[in-house]
Each structure stands twice: as C-alpha cells, then as structure tokens.
Amino acid sequence: MTAEKREAKVVLVDIEGTTTSISFVHQVLFPHAKENVEKYLKEYWENEETKQIVEDLQQVPQYADYQATLSAPPAVVDVKVIAGFVRYLIDKDLKVTPMKTLQGLIWACGYASGELKGHVYEDVPDAFRAWQKAGLRIAVYSSGSVDAQKLIFGYSVAGNLLPYLSDHFDTHVGHKQEQQSYVNISNSLREKPQNILFLTDIPGEASAALSAGLQTIILHRPGNGPLSDDQKSNYEVIPDFKSLYSLQLPQK
C-alpha cells in the first residue's frame, strides 16, 4: 500500500529523525542538557522531584558502570557525582528514563527563557493540520520524556503545535524496539493496531510496531542513518510527510 492510499484513525509519530532533525537533538538539546545539568541540580537539589530522580538514577544498571570509570568510589552522592553520571549517559546516548526526565526539566528552563526553540520540519505543521481536519488523532511516541515532547512541540519554530496532539508516550510504556510497547500503546489509545500508522526513522522500531499489528512507514530525512537494500524493500520509505497529507479515515 502506498502512502497516498493509506487509511488510519491514529498517526503515531516518532520525534528524532521523523518530525525533528537528528542534528537538533544531538547538536542543540543534548549539549544544552550537558552544559546546564550541574547548574540545574545545584538550584533544585532539595526539590522533591529532583530527589526522586537522583534516587532513581542510582538504581539503574549503568550507574555501576559509571562508578567503575571513577578513580575512587564517591564518598557521598552529591551534585557533581550525579551531574557527571548524566553527562556520561548523554555521551553514550543511553536512554535511561530518570535521565530523560531530568533532561526534560533542564530543557523546560531553556524553552521558558527563550534560549531554546523546538525544531520541526516545514512539512510537519501542514501534515498535522491536514490530519486533524480529516478527523485523525495524532499521538507521539519518543524515548524523550512526555514533558520534553511537549516542550519541543509547544515551543516549536512553527509555534505551539500541542493542540494537534491527543496523546504522548515515552519509555514508561516500554522501549521502542519491543513489540509489547506498541500493544500497550494500542490499548491505551483504545484503537485496533491496524488502525494506527506509526512513522519512524528506525527500522528496528518499525519492525516492533509491525509485529504488534500497526501500519509502519520509515522516514528517510536528510541526516538520518543509512538504510540497507533489504530495509528499503521490506518497508515503505518516504522522504517527508508530504505524501501523507491526503491520509484519511478508513472508509466504512
């Protein structure tokens, strides 16, 4: 089935490499979090939300790996220790839920101050408008926290796009290359899997969604990773959302 002829009730979009350039995430957002994590922790160290994040960070398996990189085990878990661990996770692009939550809080300060603006491709607002007009729901599934998702779309270069979005999912629903995550999303949306179209740039995510019964299309935007010949033949691949402007609800 070609993109132009597809029907769906829900469009489920990934962010990085799909609605938003990978370079924005890796060259703007991640460095901003790295540069500001220590400042943020110092300011909000006694905040209950921060305390919970710090506790959760110490429970993840990667914390032991990080400690092994230190010259000596820290005598106390302080701002510098946790900030160092967060920078370690960012450098290794490890998608750890409490770290993602902390990143979202740091970015919130950056967006509120006007230092950050969420990047979206030019075709994204047009697609959102077309899908909403056609009666489709639009949901987001990203490894970034729900709060971080809302910041990108709420403070985007195209203005506030949140009114177009009905639902947000992050790693609390499961990891993106696991079939069960998409089953959980379908259940949460109260929609049959075959009525959900998932748009992503990662073949492993497309495979997991497909195995759960969702429709899938891979976005191959500028700067995205290369696709093998097998991946190009196994999945529908499109360069942008323009061929999906005409997406409609299933005909009864």
Curated annotation (Swiss-Prot):
Catalytic activity: 5-methylsulfanyl-2,3-dioxopentyl phosphate + H2O = 1,2-dihydroxy-5-(methylsulfanyl)pent-1-en-3-one + phosphate
Co-factor(s): Mg(2+)
Main location: cytoplasm
Domain of life: Eukaryota
Disulphide-bonded residues: none
GO cellular component: cytoplasm; nucleus
Subcellular location: Cytoplasm; Nucleus
Family: Belongs to the HAD-like hydrolase superfamily. MasA/MtnC family.
Assembly and binders: Monomer.
Protein name listed in UniProt: Enolase-phosphatase E1
Protein source organism: Drosophila ananassae (Fruit fly)
